[in-house]
Each structure stands twice: as structure tokens, then as C-alpha cells.
Design a protein with these regions (language model features):
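A short, glycine- and basic residue-enriched loop/turn
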Residues: 45-46, 112, 271
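Flexible "cap/lid" subdomain of the alpha/beta-hydrolase fold that forms the substrate-access gate
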Residues: 2-17, 22-25, 32-35, 55, ...
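A short, charged, Gly/Pro-tolerant segment at domain boundaries
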Residues: 301-306
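Structural cue for short, hydrophobic secondary-structure segments
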Residues: 38-41, 64
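Serine-hydrolase catalytic-loop signature spanning alpha/beta hydrolases and amidase-signature enzymes
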Residues: 43-51, 62
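Catalytic histidine-centered segment of alpha/beta-hydrolase-like enzymes
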Residues: 271-283
């Protein structure tokens, strides 16, 4: 079994915890400049951003938290609606004095949290990036579990089972589970390396974390109602919607335009795990999008010449 190394945190970053919304959240922080928050997905942690963190920290104060129920954060038995997870992040930023004018980037489950954050904190959210996940609306009920090309998004239904079967299936098999789940959606093989597999499996072995990882999905019925509520008041901030050519593709953009008026779409040359499969692509795309009017003049000039 791959072992975790002691050099998980990139140079220039620190890992810490902070009270937020009644729990304790773990996060890494680095860089200076406007606030940029990176929100991970399932079954990952902040570690999924490790390959893009150094470049982003040259221009931003970067905060990459572990969501409630993941990594080094607490895993209580409730609070997994995406609006609740978004308030966790807002409280974390407020506690650090970083909640004013924030750019938010989400991947997978983090996409749903990022949208909920922007919808709830419109005056203090500058830009939004949504990567490789549908928003939690009626679209979820139309996703096929089986397609002519093979398995569809079967996991959305399986993970919502309330009888403990998903937890029992994973118990003692976390490394095998993460490795197989990642491989299913990975196009650039090895992008999610052995160290990352070990990281994500280890966090699932922490008390309550496997249950919490499925609670993200079990909360989606409530999320659907909350998301639909926001549809009549679309976001006006710039939004970048990224799908991957090996997985969701154009679907991400085509759904997000129903919730925001200023949407740019892009297709990553990867599978689902964009930040790990092609960090060069994602870093360049993020810097280009976030540079337009969000960063300080000095940072904008630096990015323009990078």
C-alpha cells in the first residue's frame, strides 16, 4: 500500500485548522493578493489542488480547505447540503479576514458548493469557476446510470442509499475503492498518482469520513430545491464552466447558462480529474480567466507576461 509522505504541503503553504460554522475545518494557505478559494470534490481533499497551488499563490491569497467531512476537517452527522457547506467556507474566510471579494473555484462536489457560495454571497463573490459537475437541479434525475458506451453516473444513485450498504462496501477496502473509482473517470492515466490515491483513501478511513463522503450525495434532494430557488435570479458575475472531453464535456456550460448571465465555457483535454490530469492546462485557464479584472494591477501584469 502506498504510504503518505511528510511533504504533502507545497513550499510556501501552511496547513492549519480554524473554527467555522460550529465545526473545525482544515485548510492550506499560501500566497498574497486577492482571495482565491479552491473547493475539492469526491473522494478528494485539498490535496487535489497541489499541482496548481504554487502558480496561483504567485498572484492570490489561496485558501484550499477540506470540506466538512473530508480530510482533516470534522465529520459531523449533519450539515451536508451545499448551502451549509458554503456557509462553512464563508465562516472560514471571515475568521481569517478574507471574505471580501473572493473568487471561488469548485471541482465535482466542490462545484455545487461553489455555486451555493456565490448565490448566497453575491456582493462579495468576484468570479466563479465550475469544473466537471452538474449543478444540483432536476438534471441529476435525468443522468443515466447505463449508456450504450458503458456505465453512466451510477454512483449518484448508489451513494444515496440510506441502509449503510455503501459504507459496508468500502470498509477495509478504501485504497482499492479510490484507485478503481479514480481509474473509471481518468483519461490521462497516472495523473492521480499513488501518493494521491493513498491520501484520499487515508481520509476515508478516519472516523465518520466514509459516511460523510456519501452524505454529500444523500443531501442532494434538498440541494435540488435550493438550486432551483436561485434560478430566477441568475448570477451576474463572470463564470467559467469547464467540462472534460473524456467525461461531461459541453454539459457543464449548457446547464450553467441557466443560472448565470456571463458564462464562458471550455473543454479540458482530460478526464474528470482535471487539476491532476493536466495541471498546466488548468493553471493557464484559471490565470487567464481570473486575471481579467480581479487581481491587483501588479498581479495582472505578472500574469500577462507569464
Amino acid at each position: 500500500m502506498p504510504q503518505l509522505t511528510t511533504s504533502r504541503v507545497p513550499v510556501g503553504f501552511v496547513e492549519a485548522t480554524v473554527p467555522a460554522n460550529g465545526i473545525t475545518l482544515n485548510y492550506v494557505r499560501g500566497g498574497t493578493g486577492p482571495t482565491l478559494v479552491l473547493l475539492h470534490g469526491y473522494p478528494q481533499t485539498w490535496y487535489m489542488w497541489r499541482k496548481v497551488l504554487p502558480a496561483m499563490a504567485e498572484h492570490f491569497t489561496v485558501i484550499a480547505p477540506d470540506l466538512r467531512g473530508a480530510g482533516g476537517s470534522d465529520a459531523p452527522t449533519g450539515g451536508y447540503t451545499k448551502s451549509s457547506l458554503a456557509e462553512d467556507i464563508y465562516d472560514l474566510l471571515a475568521g481569517l479576514g478574507l471574505a471580501d471579494q473572493v473568487s471561488v473555484v469548485g471541482h465535482d462536489i466542490g462545484t455545487m458548493v461553489a455555486y451555493a457560495y456565490a448565490a448566497a454571497h453575491r456582493d462579495s463573490t468576484s468570479r466563479l469557476v465550475l469544473i466537471e459537475a452538474p449543478l444540483a437541479d432536476e438534471t441529476l434525475y435525468q443522468l443515466p446510470s447505463l449508456t450504450p458506451q458503458g456505465p453512466g453516473l451510477w454512483n449518484f444513485g448508489f451513494f444515496t442509499l440510506q441502509n449503510g450498504l455503501p459504507e459496508r462496501m468500502l470498509a477495509g477496502r478504501e485504497d482499492t475503492w479510490v484507485d478503481g473509482f479514480v481509474d473509471w473517470l481518468e483519461v490521462v492515466k497516472g495523473g492521480v498518482d499513488e501518493q494521491a490515491i493513498a491520501e484520499y483513501a487515508a481520509q476515508l478511513r478516519q472516523p465518520g469520513h466514509t459516511r460523510a463522503s456519501f452524505d454529500y450525495f444523500r443531501a442532494m434532494h434538498a440541494d435540488v430545491a435550493e438550486t432551483i430557488h436561485h434560478r430566477d435570479t441568475p448570477l451576474t458575475i463572470p463564470v467559467l464552466a469547464i467540462g472534460a472531453e473524456g467525461t461531461l464535456g459541453q454539459m457543464v456550460h449548457d446547464q450553467v447558462v441557466n443560472y448565470a448571465n456571463n458564462v464562458t465555457g471550455d473543454i479540458a483535454p482530460t478526464g474528470h480529474w482535471v487539476a491532476e490530469e493536466d495541471p498546466v492546462y488548468l493553471t493557464a485557464r484559471l490565470l487567464d480567466f481570473l486575471a481579467d479584472d480581479h487581481a491587483s494591477p501588479g498581479a495582472q501584469n505578472a500574469m500577462a507576461t507569464a
